Amino acid sequence: MEKHNAPPTGHGRGDQKAEAGRDINGFRVARRDRYDSNRYSESWKRHNVEDDLSWGRMMVGNADWRYWGVYDGHSGWATSSILKEFLHKYVRRKLDKLSAKDLNDSEAIEVAMKSAFIELDDEIVSDGLAAIYEPITHAEAMCRIAPSSCGSCALLALYDPERSIVHIAGAGDSRAVLGRQQDGDNGDWVSIPLSVDHSGSNPDEMARINAEHPGEDRLFSAAGRFLGSEVTRSFGDNRRKWPKEALEDWKNGFFGRVYNTDIQTPPYATALPDVKNIKVEPGDFLILGTDGFWNHVSNEDAVYCVRLWIEAQAKDISEQKRNIQIAAQVTMSKHQGRSRNGICIRITG
C-alpha cells in the first residue's frame, strides 16, 4: 500500500490539497496485510456493536504463535473493525524483521509491538486527515475519515510456544489477567494483572499527560475524564490528535462533532501500549476483557469463575452448568443495570 502523506501540522485550508498518490477514479489494489481505507470500506457493514475481538495463529520465525485481541470501540465501530483485521498483521510484520536471536529477547519483542501499534494508528489518523483535503467524493472522504473520527482501545496477546511466554500489549482500559494455581493442585488460585488501565483515574497517566502539556489545566474533568473520554490512550480519536484548524475544517465540511475547542498542543492521546510478558506454567489461563466486563467483575472474581469451570470438568455436566450460572450471578448481580458499556471478553488456556 502506498503510504499517505498527511498535511503538515497546522494545515487547515480547504483549498489546499494533500498529495496522497491514490487513484481517485477507483479503488486501488492493496496488500491485504496493510490498512487501506478504500479497500476496507467495501466490506463495512452497518451495525451497532462497537467492540470486537480476534484470535488465530501466525508463523513467527519457525514457530506457530497464537494471538488473541479485544478491541473496545467508542464513538462508532469503524476503528475497532480496522484493529480486528490489521493490528496482528502489523505486529507480525514487525516480528518478521527480527533475527532469531531477537525473537528470544522479550525487550526486542516489546519494541516491535509498540512500533506496530504506533504505525497503524499513525496511518489511521493521517489517512483521515488527508481525506479532508483531497479532490475525492464526499462519500469516499467520509469512509476514510471514519476510522480516525471513531476510536478504540486495543489489547493484544501473543503466545510464543517455544519459550512458553505470553506477551501482552495494551493501549486503553481493557485488561488482561492471568489465573494461576499456586503450590500444585491443592494451592490457592491467584490473579496476576498483565496490563495497565490507561484512564483519567490513573495518577501515572495524569502526571504523564500534564508533564507533556504544561499549563493546560482543562485536560481532565473533576470526574477524571480526559478531554471528554474515559481513556488516555487509544487508536483513532481525531478530536485529541488533529490540529485545531483541521478539526474546524472537518466540522464545517463533514459535520464533524468537535467537543473541545481549546486545542493548543496536539496530539494529546497516543496508541503507545504498555507491554508485559510472563512465563506460562501448566494450568494457567488468560482472561482478556474490555472495561465493560471489568466494571462488573474484579480480577479475583473473574479468576474464581474460570476456576469453578475448570474444577467442574471432571464432574457431572449438569453440576458444571449450575456452578457456572451461580458464579455469573454472584459476580454480575452486584452491578446489574448500572452500566450500558459494551462487554467483550476472551478466555484462553
Where are these regions (language model features)?
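PP2C/PPM-type serine/threonine phosphatase catalytic core
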Residues: M1-Y67, G73-G349
